[in-house]
Amino acid sequence: MPELPEVETVRRGLEQKLNNFIIKKVEVCRNSTVAFPTEKEEFIKGLQNSLLYKWDRRGKYLIAELKKIENENIKFPLKKLRQNNGFLVVHLRMTGYFKFIDNSTQPCKHTRIRVFDKKNNELRYIDVRSFGQMWWIKEGLSPNKIIKGLGSLGPEPFSKNFDEKYLKKVISKRKKSIKAILLDQTIVAGIGNIYADESLYSAGISPFRAAKTIKKNELINLKESIVNVLKKSIGSGGTTFSDFRDLEGENGNFGLQTNVYRRTGKECRKCGNLIEKQKIAGRSTHWCPNCQK
């Protein structure tokens, strides 16, 4: 599943590539991809004549702020756009990704949503396993209330609210493993299996440790490790092990730099001991028994 760095990579690509993109036509190739409104016709009508004004990210969700455009001959850059048209929210889930196409390329087998501007440039959403979802939240409704998972997210790892004091507060009485805690999106948004493993390795903390046993200095180190690992991955365009692609169709390169994730049986880059794998909270967990205590 695309995690924070992959979703942030997509967000940056969308923001750069879709500057001044006004939706003229929407084609829904798979109805189940549209999570809200329940009728695809309302989803299509809601998006038409909307400017993809600004792209944000919250955890693993992409959120596009929409502006209603009535005049096709509007001139850019736009200084004042007063008529909001709600939000387009996207969750890529396991295998979803976007591709920008500036010609009449036929849709591939796994194309789920097609969005066109008046020049017939296309933003294509492709999803092999079809778990990804999209929501059009009309003006006046709150995305946090419509989308349960969005409203329950914990703080962003890069935010001021995510520090050792916050971590100490949320884990002080928890018997769960620190790995399971990091995967909990209500505690911290955007971290998945890859970056939980890599962050714990960087911090020298065993993924099996009960969260409540982590000391203050370790929490400080863990917070810094999380931020540094995420930044490094974003700088590498995220991680591709199977389906993830950026807007240009390129793979992420962080997978070549991982220290423990998917390196079972290989030598630890620090100590030379072999990397091990075991399941925690139903997820494959990779760690170095010598470097992580």
From Swiss-Prot:
CDD domains: EcFpg-like_N
Zn finger intervals (FPG-type): 259-293
Active site (record annotation): 2-3, 60, 283
A single GO BP: base-excision repair
Domain of life, per lineage: Bacteria
Residues binding DNA, per UniProt: 110, 129, 174
Function comment: Involved in base excision repair of DNA damaged by oxidation or by mutagenic agents. Acts as a DNA glycosylase that recognizes and removes damaged bases. Has a preference for oxidized purines, such as 7,8-dihydro-8-oxoguanine (8-oxoG). Has AP (apurinic/apyrimidinic) lyase activity and introduces nicks in the DNA strand. Cleaves the DNA backbone by beta-delta elimination to generate a single-strand break at the site of the removed base with both 3'- and 5'-phosphates.
Protein name (record): Formamidopyrimidine-DNA glycosylase
Organism: Prochlorococcus marinus (strain MIT 9312)
